[in-house]
Amino acid sequence: MINIALLGLGRIGVMHGKNLMRNKDFKLKYVYDINKKLTLKISKELKSNPIYNPSVAFKDREIDAVFIASTTSTHIKLILEAVKYKKAIFCEKPLDLNINKINNCKKKINKFNPKIQLGFNRRYDPGHNNLKKELIKGRIGKLEKIIITSRDPAPPSIKYLKVSGGIFK
């Protein structure tokens, strides 16, 4: 059993939490968000323990890995803390909006030899999976070229835009 702490409970964080719950090899031990009411609400939905400071998860020796799905501006700070406690890390994209900060983070964490993955693919996107299934079944024909336009089904809120990972800046 791999014990996980989920940090950040926005749209993508909740999606990761639900996906983790579906896998019998993972236990979502903690959930955290800067919004305490949201933390409590989502902890009930995901049958997890609410925490109100990420350091609780970092210091817990039972936690094997952290999923960082908080706002982009918090990613590096959380990663730097997680590596000190030898946690495996999954971090949503982007790591940061500033290449110098990213390079500095890389230098700082290398001495810890961390297990870290950035969520930068659409491998499990339902639309992509459906396309693959249809191709395998031969319903589409011979594949020659794919051009993809990727977007959410609805525009994001103004509140989200203020802390988004830079796609709208």
Task: Please provide the spans of the model-predicted regions.
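N-terminal Rossmann-like dinucleotide-binding module
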Residues: 1-45
